[in-house]
């Protein structure tokens, strides 16, 4: 009887492990959305004939630690009358409000502090939506380390 239970357990675990990757790595579809590697350095995106640069330190970017966010605007956006801000969240998941308020630090650069929380689902793909008042939004999608 003990041998039968062991064999059934082995069969069950083998079947689970062979089919689990699709279930365990549910955020694979979000991995394909990543457009930024903040661990390597600042990320740059074009926005309405302008450029938005996002930098997060310290690197590597880890959840549940105090992070320093820096946004630099170029082109017409460099004369934005109001400071941009960052909303942190996860693609496809409502994480509740997590806003990084940015303050001007000179030369069309804005800085602020924030924390990326650890998601109970285990997903590590995060999104920083930078809102430039009266101009629009741009998304930087990246991985964090837990």
Name the predicted role of every residue range.
Residues 22-125, 129-132, 138-146:
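Contiguous segments within soluble domain cores/interaction surfaces
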Residues 1-9:
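Bacterial N-terminal signal peptides that target proteins for export
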